Amino acid sequence: MDAMIGDPMSATSVEAVFEKQPSPEFRELVTPRAMAVAVVLSVVICFVGMRIQMTAGIVPALNMPASILSFFLLKWLIRLLQSCGFPMLPFTRQENMFLLTCIITCLNLALTSGFATNIIGMTSTVARSLADDPDPRDIMDHVPIGKWIVYLFLVGMTGVLINVPFNQVMIIDYKLLFPTGTVIAQLINSFHTPEGAYVAKMQVATIFKVFFGSFSWSMFQWFYTAGDDCGFQHFPTFGLGLYKHRFYFDFSATYIGLGMICPHIVNFGLFFGAIISWGFLYPFLETKRGQWYQTDSPTSLNGQNGYKVFISVTLIITDGMINFLTLITTASINFYQLRKEHDLGLANYFKKHPSLNYDDRKRIEVFLANRIPIPVPVAAYITCAAISTIAIPAMFNQIKFYHLAVLYMVIPVVTFCNTYATGLTDWSVAPTYAKFTTFVFAAWIAKPGAVVASLLASGVIVAALHISSQAMQDLKSGHMTLTSPRAMVTGQIFGVAVGSILCPCVFLAFQSTTKPNAPVGSKQSDYPCPFAGLYRAIGVIGTGGVKELPKHCMTFCVVAFCVTVIIDAVVLVSQKRGWSIHRYIPSMTVIALPFFAGSYFTIDMCVGSLLLLAWTRMNAKSAEMLSSAVAAGLICGEGLFTLPSALLNMFKVQPPMCMKFLSGGEEVEAADSFLNNLGTSRT
C-alpha cells in the first residue's frame, strides 16, 4: 500500500473494508453482461418514466429503483451463468456503478427527450389547443424516427462531453456533495461489503431497517391519495393560510434524508430563500394582480409565473457566472503554479491537503490516476457542437446554424451553473433554463417558425444540462466506489447510444395505442402530456419579446442581479482576508431554488438537519457512523416505492381514499351536504 494514502485502520473507514480487494481493470468493469442488463433495465425504466411523464407530467426520482434492480438482476444473471458452467469474473461495486450509470443516463435522456414536452408542443394537436388558427409554419407533426435518433444522440453526447472538464473541479476541488450520488454510493458500497467488517455490517443493517420503514410509510401514504392535493403530502401543518403559500411539512422521507446529508448552511439557506419568496415577495405580487399583470394562470409567463422564472434564473445564472469567472481568473493568475502542481501529481496534492482521511486519499488517488485529459473532452465537445450546428438545421429548417452556434457557446457556462447548483442541493433546474431559452429564442427569431425553433433550442438545453448534472451525480458515486472516471464516461456514452434509439421507439409504442380522436397531447388522450402546452405557450408569448412579460419583471431581475453580485463579493473578500463571515452566508443558488420550486421541501430538509444536530449532540460517534446510512435508507425506501406506485397507476389501480383538509365554515358545510347526499343516494 502507498504510504501517502494514510492509515486505513479507522472505525468508520469504508475503503479499509475493501482493502483486500484488488482494483478491477477497465475490461473488468465494461463487460458484455453489464451492457446486456443495462439494455434490459433501460427498456423497463424508460417505459415507466416516459409513461409517467406523458400522463402526470412530473416524474419522481427513479435512481433508487434502478440502483437496487441493477444490483439484483446482474447478480442473478451471474449466478445463473455460473450454474450453467460458465466461468465468471467477480461482481464488483465498480462494475455495478458502470451498469447503473448506463441505465441512469438512458433514463435521463428519455425524460429530457421532449416526447412529453417540447416535441409534442410542436404538434398541431397542442397548437390548436392554444389557438383556433395556428400558423402551419409553427407546426411540425410527422418527423421520421431516424431524425429523432440523430437529434437525441447529438444532444445526449453534448450533455456527457461538456460535463467531463468540470469533473475534478466539482468533485475534488469544490468537494460538492451531490446528495443523490453520495447516497447511491453508500448503497452500492453496502451491497458489496465483504463479510466480517463490523462497522460496515452495522451500516448495512441500518440501511435496510430504515429502508423497510421508509418503504412501508410510503405505501401507507399511498392509500390516502385518491384525488388531487390529497394525502399526507398536503398536510397543512402550519394552517391553511400558510399552506396556500406552500409552507407545510409533507412527511417526505426523501427530503428528510437529504436534509441529513446536506450541509446545515444549505438546508437553512433553502429555508431562508423560501421565506423571502413565498413568505414576502409572492404575497406582495398577488396584491398587484390586475395592475401589473392580468392572468390568473399559474403557468403563464405574462402572469406571476413570469416573476418566478426570471428572478430565479437571474439569481442562479449570476451566482454561477461569478463562480465560473472566479475559477477561470484564479486558474489564469496561478497558471504557472497549477502547471507545476500538475507535473508533480498526486504526491504534491496530498502534501497540500494533509488533513485528508484515508477514504478521501484513496478515492482521489484512483480518480486522478484514471482521469481523462481535459483536451480530449474539449475537442470532442467542439466536434459534437460543429456536427450539431450543421446536422440539426439540415433536419429542421426552422432553426439556423447561427442559433445553434450561439447555443453551444452558452452551454458550457450554464452547465457549470446548473451542475454547481445540483452539487449543493440535489436540484437540477434544467427545466427552468429550458423555459428561459424558449422565451429568449422565440423573441430573438420573432417570425413564422420561431415557436418550433425555440422549442428545438430548449430541447438541446434541457437535455444537455440535465444529463450533465446527473452524470456528475454518477461520477460522484463512482468516486466514492473507486470506479474509474473513464469507465463511468464510457457507460454514459453507451447509455446515450441506447437511449437515442430506445426513446423514439417507446414513444411510437405509446402513440400506436392512442385512439384516433384522442392523439398524444390532447386533453382527452391517455397521454395528455400536460407540460407540452406550457412550453408552446412560452414560445408563443416569446415572439412578442420582453414587452409580453408582466410589469416590473425586468426591474426585479436587475435587483436580483445586483444583490447576488454584492453578496458574492462579500463572500470572496471574506475568504481572501480570512474572515469567518463567509461560513454563515449560503450560496445565492441555494437561496434561489425555492423561488421557483416551492417552499415545502425546505421544511423537510430543515427537519433532517435538526434531527442530525440533535443526534450528534446526544451521541456524536453514532451519528458520524450511521447518519449517512439512515439518510440512504430514508431516500431509497421512498424512492423504490415509486416503481410499484407507477405500475399501479399504469394499470389504473387507484388509491381507495382521499384525505383532504378544508377551512371551516361554508366549505365544510358544502362537503358535509355532499357526503350526506351521497350516502342517501346509495341507500
From Swiss-Prot:
Matches recorded under InterPro entries: OPT, YSL-like
Example GO molecular function: oligopeptide transmembrane transporter activity
Membrane topology: Multi-pass membrane protein
UniProt KW Oxidoreductase keyword: no
Source taxon at top rank: Eukaryota
Predominant cellular place of this UniProt entry's protein: membrane
Transmembrane segments: 29-49, 58-78, 97-117, 142-162, 204-224, 265-285, 309-329, 372-392, 404-424, 448-468, 490-510, 553-573, 595-615, 628-648
Keyword Transport among record annotations: yes
Gene Ontology terms: cellular component: membrane
Location(s), subcellular: Membrane
Keywords from the named record: Membrane, Transmembrane, Transmembrane helix, Transport
Family per similarity comment: Belongs to the YSL (TC 2.A.67.2) family.
Functional note: May be involved in the transport of nicotianamine-chelated metals.
Cited NCBIfam families: OPT_sfam
Protein name: Probable metal-nicotianamine transporter YSL3
Source species: Oryza sativa subsp. japonica (Rice)
Gene: YSL3
